[in-house]
């Protein structure tokens, strides 16, 4: 089964105290209306798993989606940033919720940062990269809506973004289109690698914690 296929909605939370216990999470983040929810739907091969709106700022909570292929693994749709047409109190709550989640969530193992390919590397995108870099975890950038550009424009944008982020070794980048189903396999390969890395680290920790059977028994030496 493909990694994301048949993912299901699990829960939505508005406060960190309500976050569910999970083994591993991959979070989707980006500017409002960059295409986060559309990306989740395309990857899961579902049309209405994550709510898609033409109005920016509709994702106001943290939404969890459980992977059918790995029951303890989750996709997380975070509130979009950069949308000004909401009350200041609401925007302040989003900022606190998003920031504290990214800083403190122990089960978060990687970030999928969605940027509109026609308008990448906005100031808030760069702030997000700098903020998350402190965790030392990988970020994979999806240059969404790339189908709105011709091939020459796509290649130029991809090269420009790669050059601009050369100083971010934990970042990888690709073109992506939810509507045309382009780039899905590449995203799946990247995220599967993150999960495999987590499982390898967990296996190493278990091995390190086991007693060494080769250690001689002091009583047998007498």
Curated annotation (Swiss-Prot):
The gene is engB. Belongs to the TRAFAC class TrmE-Era-EngA-EngB-Septin-like GTPase superfamily. EngB GTPase family. Mg(2+) binds at residues 37, 59. Residues 22-197 form the EngB-type G domain. Its cofactor is Mg(2+). Keywords: Cell cycle, Cell division, GTP-binding, Magnesium, Metal-binding, Nucleotide-binding, Septation. The keyword Magnesium applies. This is Probable GTP-binding protein EngB. The lineage of its organism: Bacteria, Pseudomonadati, Pseudomonadota, Betaproteobacteria, Neisseriales. GO terms for cellular component: cytosol.
């Amino acid at each position: 089964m493909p990694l994301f296929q048949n993912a299901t909605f699990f829960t939505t939370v508005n406060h960190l105290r309500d976050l569910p216990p999970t083994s591993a999470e991959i979070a989707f983040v980006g500017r409002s209306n960059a295409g986060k929810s559309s990306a989740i739907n395309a990857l899961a091969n579902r049309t209405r798993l994550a709510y898609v709106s033409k109005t920016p700022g509709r994702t106001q909570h943290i939404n969890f989606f459980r992977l059918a292929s790995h029951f303890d693994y989750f996709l997380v749709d975070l509130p979009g940033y950069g949308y000004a047409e909401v009350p200041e109190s609401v925007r302040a709550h989003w900022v606190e919720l998003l920031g504290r989640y990214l800083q403190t969530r122990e089960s978060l193992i990687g970030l999928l940062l969605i940027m509109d390919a026609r308008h990448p590397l906005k100031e808030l995108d760069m702030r997000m990269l700098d903020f998350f870099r402190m965790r030392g975890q990988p970020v994979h950038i999806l240059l969404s809506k790339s189908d709105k550009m011709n091939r020459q424009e796509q290649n130029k944008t991809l090269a420009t973004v790669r050059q601009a982020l050369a100083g971010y070794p934990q970042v990888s980048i690709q073109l992506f289109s939810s509507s045309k189903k382009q780039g899905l396999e590449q995203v799946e390969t990247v995220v599967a690698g993150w999960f495999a890395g987590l499982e390898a680290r967990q296996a190493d920790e278990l091995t390190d914690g086991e007693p060494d059977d080769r250690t001689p028994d002091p009583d047998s030496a007498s």
